[in-house]
Amino acid sequence: MTTTPDLRVGVGGAGQMGADHIQRITRVISGATVSAIVEPDAGRAAAAAAAPGSRAFASLDDALDASALEAVVIATPGQFHELVLVPALAAGLPVLCEKPLTPDSAEALRVLELEQTLDRPHIQLGFMRRFDDEYRALRELVVSGDAGELLFLRGVHRNPSVPESYTQSMLITDSVVHEFDVMPWLAGSPVASVEVKYPRRNDRAPERLREPILVLIELRNGVLVDVEMNVSVRFGYQVATEAVFQTGTARIGQPAGLQRWSDARFSIAEHTSFTTRFARAYDAQVQAWVDAVRDGSLVAGPNAWDGYLVALACEAGVRALSEPGPIAFAPAERPAFYA
C-alpha cells in the first residue's frame, strides 16, 4: 500500500500510447501523479514532460536509482516489454503493461516465472475493452443466462489506415490481439484454435498487406468466434461485436456520434482512432489499477497469465496467416499463483 498522498507513477515510453497515459494520469486519474517518464528519445521525453513535477530518464534503472517512482505503466513497443518488466519486477513495482505482455509465449513464461518469486501478482495487462461499459454489459448478459447459452460471437475491427511500420503479422499481434483477450473473457473460455481466411483483397490497402482477413477462433467450450480485421477501411475506426444466444442476439459498438440530416442524407459521426473510441475504458482501467495499487491488491483486471494465453493465441494466429487449416495449441498448466 502506498504511503504517499498520491501514487508516484512512472510511464515507460512516450510515444502515442505513453503520451496518452501521461495526459490521462495528469488530468483525469485521482490518487496518482506522473513522477517519471522513461524514454530514451530525448525529444519525446521532453515533449511528454508536460506532466508537472515529472522527471525524464533514459532507462527504468535510472529512474529506480533515483527512487523516482512507486509503480510503472509500460507503453513501449511490445518487443521491449521484457526489458522493462524484468527490472520492474525485481524492484517489486506494481505494473500496468500495455498489450502485449511480450511478443511470444517463451518470453511470457519467463516473465511469469519471475513474477512468481513475488508474494502475489504485480502485473496488470492493458486490455482496456474489459473496462468498456458496453463490453461489460454484454458479459453480464452472458453470465446471467437471460438469453440462454452463448452460441457464437461475431466481431469487426476496422481501422481507417495504419502507419508504414505496420506489417502483415501485426494484423494479428497488434490488432486481433485484443479479440484474443476479450472474446474468451466474454464467453468464459480460452482459445483452442485459430484459423485465417483471405477474402478478396482490398486493392487500396498498402502493397505490403494482404487484407482484410477473416479470423476464425474456436474456444474450448465450443463457442465459435469470427473476426473481420480490416485496416484500410478509410471511413473511420470501428470495433463492434454481435453475440448470438439460444433465444436472441445482442450487439455492442454501434455508431453513437452526431446524427445529421442534410441534403436528403442521414449520417452518424464515427470515431477515427482507438484513443477516442475507448477513452472512457482507458480512464476506467487506469483508475481501477491505481486504486488497486493504493489499497494493496495491485491488480484489478487481466493479469500476466492472461497475457501468456494471448501470446499463445497470437503465435497461432501468425502461423495461420500462411498455413491452412485451424492451428490448435494448448497452454501450460495454470499455476495456483494465478488462480
UniProtKB/Swiss-Prot annotation:
SUPFAM superfamilies: Glyceraldehyde-3-phosphate dehydrogenase-like, C-terminal domain, NAD(P)-binding Rossmann-fold domains. Its EC number is 1.1.1.18. GO terms for biological process: inositol catabolic process. One of its GO terms (molecular function) is inositol 2-dehydrogenase (NAD+) activity. It catalyses: myo-inositol + NAD(+) = scyllo-inosose + NADH + H(+). Keywords: NAD, Oxidoreductase. It comes from the Bacteria. The keyword Oxidoreductase applies. InterPro entries: Gfo-Idh-MocA_inositol_DH, Gfo/Idh/MocA-like_OxRdtase_N, GFO_IDH_MocA-like_dom, MI/DCI_dehydrogenase, NAD(P)-bd_dom_sf. Belongs to the Gfo/Idh/MocA family. This is Inositol 2-dehydrogenase. It comes from Leifsonia xyli subsp. xyli (strain CTCB07). The lineage of its organism: Bacteria, Bacillati, Actinomycetota, Actinomycetes, Micrococcales. The gene is iolG.
